[in-house]
Amino acid sequence: MNQQLSCDHLWFGADIVTMQNGRYGIIEQGAIAVSGQQIIWVGPYADSAHIQARQRTDLGGGIVTPGLVDCHTHLVFGGDRSDEFEQRLNGVSYSEIAAQVGGILATVRATRSASQAELVDAARQRLQHLLAEGVTTVEIKSGYGLEVASELRMLQAIRQLAQQVPAQIQATCLAAHAVPPEYRHDPEAWVDVICDQLLPQVAAEGLADAVDAFCEHLAFSPDQVRRVFIAAKALGFALKLHAEQLSSLGGSALAAEFDALSADHVEYATESDVAAMAQHGTVAVLLPGAFYLLREKQRPPVELFRRYQVPMALASDANPGTSPALSLRLMMNMGCTLFGMTPEEALAGVTLHAARALGLAQRIGSLESGKMADFVHWPLARPAELVYWLGGQLPCRVIFRGEER
């Protein structure tokens, strides 16, 4: 006989896709008991007679999933680069665009000239698209300021945005995103600034949860990333890394060496990289939006990740240059159609494994007692439909921290 249990709200009348251990874990005709912001019981509604609820909601069918988690975005930036997209489709090369001082430097200029209020307002509009699809947790990176004052302003904008939206926002300092134009002849000096000036100030003001870098031949070398990681780890930051997107430099193994939460992109990760990630619990964050827009050919080694049991997350990588994507569900479909993931892996990739990539798997990402009450009610019969449909089928309800938003 179950012990009597009291809760604030009992949600029932739908199939619960728990995603415990990264599997669907479906409870048919299930129920979720919530007290305050937390789940205190999940199970079949037929077994809930012992629960005394102050409020009950019959969902009337459909499925319930954990709130979706977008674990890699660049939502805060100034300006717009749709003109470059059009130029490329009219035959203008990347090098020609760069010669016109376009590309990432165009975003850097626009971001540096934008006020904090302008950055927040623009990012909020982008973020609303993700939230409308059932996203309840979002990571947002800096990295378009590339000078101390502008990087701090970006992180302050992220913090301000977090206070204005019904979602959990995780901030990541990505000052090692590209070499600033002022340091193009001396990138080591910019690494000095990051390590000696910027990161200590970010830590002192509590502006970031993690530190990221871009390890690639057109950005920062493994040795330069190592310097950033040593400084960041000494200050208590969690670590993440853009690695193996365009070439194999051993960045994924470097991330694992430092016990980084994730290595992201990872198209060129080797078996030794994957083995290192498995040993250190580093999540592989796959970013099909950038792969698609750049028309890349090298797919991430999904079979190796499976074989070595490396958790695979999916994210939008929402950014103005290589992934202007504001739909996490589209990324789920791309993860399946472009990378060969299964629908179950894709859903795990935007719930439990995405939570792991943010160091939050003990609090969010699956529906079980003790976790935060973040969940989404969908007008669907099967979880695979979330991946199958391209657009449409918005949530019936989104519950964030126990409250319908």
Curated annotation (Swiss-Prot):
Q: How is the cofactor bound?
A: Binds 1 zinc or iron ion per subunit.
Catalytic activity from the UniProt record: 4-imidazolone-5-propanoate + H2O = N-formimidoyl-L-glutamate
Q: Which cell locations does it reside in?
A: Cytoplasm
Write down the superkingdom of origin.
Bacteria
Q: Mention one GO biological process in which this protein takes part, according to its record.
A: L-histidine catabolic process to glutamate and formamide
Q: What is its main location?
A: cytoplasm
Q: Which cofactor does it need?
A: Zn(2+); Fe(3+)
Residues annotated for Fe(3+) binding in this entry: H72, H74, H242, D317
Q: Give the UniProt keywords, A-Z.
A: Cytoplasm, Histidine metabolism, Hydrolase, Iron, Metal-binding, Zinc
Q: What is its EC number?
A: 3.5.2.7
Which SUPFAM superfamilies does the entry mention? Composite domain of metallo-dependent hydrolases (SSF51338), Metallo-dependent hydrolases (SSF51556)
Q: A GO molecular function for this record?
A: zinc ion binding
Q: Where does 4-imidazolone-5-propanoate bind?
A: R81, Y144, H177, Q245, T322
Annotated binding of N-formimidoyl-L-glutamate, by residue:
Y144, N319, G321
Pathway, per UniProt?
Answer: Amino-acid degradation; L-histidine degradation into L-glutamate; N-formimidoyl-L-glutamate from L-histidine: step 3/3
GO cellular component terms, alphabetically, are:
cytoplasm
Against InterPro entries, the record matches this protein to: Amidohydro-rel, HutI, Metal-dep_hydrolase_composite, Metal_Hydrolase
Q: Which CDD domains match?
A: Imidazolone-5PH
Q: Where does Zn(2+) bind?
A: H72, H74, H242, D317
Free-text function comment from the UniProt entry = Catalyzes the hydrolytic cleavage of the carbon-nitrogen bond in imidazolone-5-propanoate to yield N-formimidoyl-L-glutamate. It is the third step in the universal histidine degradation pathway.
Return the NCBIfam families for the record.
hutI
Q: Which family does it belong to?
A: Belongs to the metallo-dependent hydrolases superfamily. HutI family.
Q: What is this protein called?
A: Imidazolonepropionase
Species for this entry: Erwinia tasmaniensis (strain DSM 17950 / CFBP 7177 / CIP 109463 / NCPPB 4357 / Et1/99)
Which gene holds the coding sequence for this protein?
A: hutI
